[in-house]
């Protein structure tokens, strides 16, 4: 969430920055209006409390019983007024908090302007799309022909946008997860294995709520939410904590399945496994000192790019424009791999700096020195990488004319030395 002091002290700057991302300035005005109401109520409450305290001291010195009783009755009325104002204050604070939570993060000044993804800027590309001497097939045809993806039984089990991985297909997915975790540990991340369901407070802390409520799965009976990304539980590992400066940076990697209703993507990517209600992802996450967060963003990007490189995939990196930037992000790099069977680039990693946006909501702070006033950390997140799109890219790039799929070298030790996937 944004700093209310920043909004109060620099409203024009905040409106201009949010305007670059298409935010109506009226949303900022609403937050400021609630803030003024809250401050006015606080002033009135403090004034009445000061009056009550002063008169209470006088009452103790009064010798006239009638005068004392009169003052006591007056102070009871003052107390009732304070209680009523406190209730009004709580209601205004709740409305202000709700309005504040609707505001997205401020785009970094260096982020390119643009209304949508067509204005994203390609800043790097490594490799060229493979030249085939046959027509490459899309992964859904390869998967069915090799009997490693079963769409029909996925639908039978759970409905549309579900599938079953079988045999070496399932093993390839597991190999990718294990290899990516091992790689990120080598890159300096600490592995954690978290719950896949979390309390609602975790969703607010990671800023998934209220923005993405309709895209999330929830267990209503126990009031638990299925994670849409490992970013949610990992953010909340240090919720309501004060870290010491010498603990930073904290870098974590985590595997979770991810659950999304995909209501925002209805009708898109209905073939294959590109977009499902359940998918696997390895996440990289950082808690860092504010002074180093943009250096850490470059590390995050480099680590995600290295993952693509080691898999032998052609990839490119884009900087997202203001209109495509995620709700919580100040700056984001998307890394895309080429999928020749579909003839398109697939996003497998999105690396973002969110500065203090999540930390303020989750109350995650650090102390720069003993006795110093705690300040909010900066947090960053990046996919390292997302499945099944990485699986798609491997299947389509490593396919052979006979329909088999060569297994990338780095994954073979995780697959018992298997070198190729053929129909058994």
UniProtKB/Swiss-Prot annotation:
Give me the residues that bind ATP, please.
Answer: 260-262, 347-350
Q: Does the keyword Protein biosynthesis apply?
A: yes
Q: Which reaction does it catalyse?
A: tRNA(Ser) + L-serine + ATP = L-seryl-tRNA(Ser) + AMP + diphosphate + H(+); tRNA(Sec) + L-serine + ATP = L-seryl-tRNA(Sec) + AMP + diphosphate + H(+)
An example molecular function term from Gene Ontology annotations: ATP binding
**Top-level taxon of origin:** Bacteria
Give the principal location in a single coarse category.
Answer: cytoplasm
Report the Pfam families cross-referenced here. Seryl_tRNA_N, tRNA-synt_2b
- Signal peptide residues are none
For this protein, the record's Gene3D superfamilies field holds:
Bira Bifunctional Protein, Domain 2, Serine-tRNA synthetase, tRNA binding domain
What is the enzyme's class at the highest EC level?
ligase
Q: Which InterPro entries match?
A: aa-tRNA-synt_IIb, aa-tRNA-synth_II, aa-tRNA-synth_II/BPL/LPL, Ser-tRNA-ligase_type_1, Ser-tRNA-synth_1_N, SerRS_1_N_sf, SerRS_core, tRNA-bd_arm
Question: Where is it localised?
Answer: Cytoplasm
This entry's Enzyme Commission designation comes to 6.1.1.11
Sorted alphabetically, the keyword list is:
Aminoacyl-tRNA synthetase, ATP-binding, Cytoplasm, Ligase, Nucleotide-binding, Protein biosynthesis
Q: Which GO terms describe its cellular component?
A: cytoplasm
Q: What is known of its domains?
A: Consists of two distinct domains, a catalytic core and a N-terminal extension that is involved in tRNA binding.
Name the job this protein performs.
Catalyzes the attachment of serine to tRNA(Ser). Is also able to aminoacylate tRNA(Sec) with serine, to form the misacylated tRNA L-seryl-tRNA(Sec), which will be further converted into selenocysteinyl-tRNA(Sec).
Question: Record's HAMAP family?
Answer: Ser_tRNA_synth_type1
Subunit composition and interactions: Homodimer. The tRNA molecule binds across the dimer.
- Similarity comment: family membership: Belongs to the class-II aminoacyl-tRNA synthetase family. Type-1 seryl-tRNA synthetase subfamily.
This chain belongs to which protein, by name?
Answer: Serine--tRNA ligase
Q: Origin organism of this chain? A: Roseiflexus castenholzii (strain DSM 13941 / HLO8)
From the broadest rank down, the organism's phylogenetic lineage runs:
Bacteria, Bacillati, Chloroflexota, Chloroflexia, Chloroflexales
């Amino acid at each position: 969430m944004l700093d209310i002091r920043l909004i109060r002290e620099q409203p024009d700057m905040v409106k201009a920055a949010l305007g670059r991302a298409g935010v109506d300035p009226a949303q900022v005005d609403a937050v400021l209006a609630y803030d003024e109401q809250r401050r006015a109520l606080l002033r009135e409450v403090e004034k009445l409390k000061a009056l009550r305290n002063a008169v209470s001291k006088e009452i103790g010195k009064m010798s006239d019983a009638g005068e004392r009783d009169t003052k006591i009755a007056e102070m009871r009325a003052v107390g009732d007024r304070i209680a009523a104002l406190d209730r009004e204050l709580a209601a205004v604070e709740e409305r202000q908090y709700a309005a504040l939570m609707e505001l997205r993060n401020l785009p970094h000044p260096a982020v390119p302007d643009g209304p949508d993804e067509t204005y994203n800027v390609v800043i790097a590309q490594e490799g060229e799309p493979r030249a085939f001497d046959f027509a490459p097939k899309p992964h859904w045809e390869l998967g069915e022909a090799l009997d490693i993806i079963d769409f029909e039984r996925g639908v039978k089990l759970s409905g549309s946008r579900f599938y079953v991985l079988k045999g070496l297909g399932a093993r390839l997915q597991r190999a990718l997860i294990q290899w990516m975790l091992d790689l990120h540990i080598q890159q300096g991340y600490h592995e954690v294995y978290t719950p896949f369901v979390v309390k609602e407070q975790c969703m607010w802390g990671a800023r998934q709520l209220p923005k993405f409520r309709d895209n999330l799965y929830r267990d209503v009976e126990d009031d638990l939410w299925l994670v849409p990304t490992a970013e949610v539980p990992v953010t909340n590992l240090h919720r309501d904590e004060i870290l010491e400066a010498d603990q930073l940076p904290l870098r974590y990697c985590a595997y979770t399945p991810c659950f999304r209703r995909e209501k925002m993507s209805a009708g898109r990517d209905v073939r294959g496994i590109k977009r499902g209600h359940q998918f696997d992802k390895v996440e990289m996450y950082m808690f860092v000192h504010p002074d180093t967060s943009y250096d850490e963003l470059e590390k995050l990007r480099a680590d995600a790019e290295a993952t693509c490189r080691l898999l032998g995939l052609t990839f490119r990196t884009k900087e997202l424009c203001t209109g495509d930037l995620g709700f919580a992000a100040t700056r984001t790099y998307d890394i895309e791999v080429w999928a020749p069977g579909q003839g398109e680039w697939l996003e497998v990693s999105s690396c973002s700096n969110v500065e203090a946006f999540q930390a303020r909501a989750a109350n995650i702070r650090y102390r720069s020195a003993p006795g110093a006033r705690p300040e909010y950390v900066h947090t960053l997140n990046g996919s390292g990488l997302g499945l099944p799109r990485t699986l798609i890219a491997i299947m389509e790039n490593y396919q052979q004319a006979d329909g088999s799929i060569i297994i990338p070298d780095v994954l073979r030790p995780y697959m018992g030395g298997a070198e190729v996937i053929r129909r058994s």
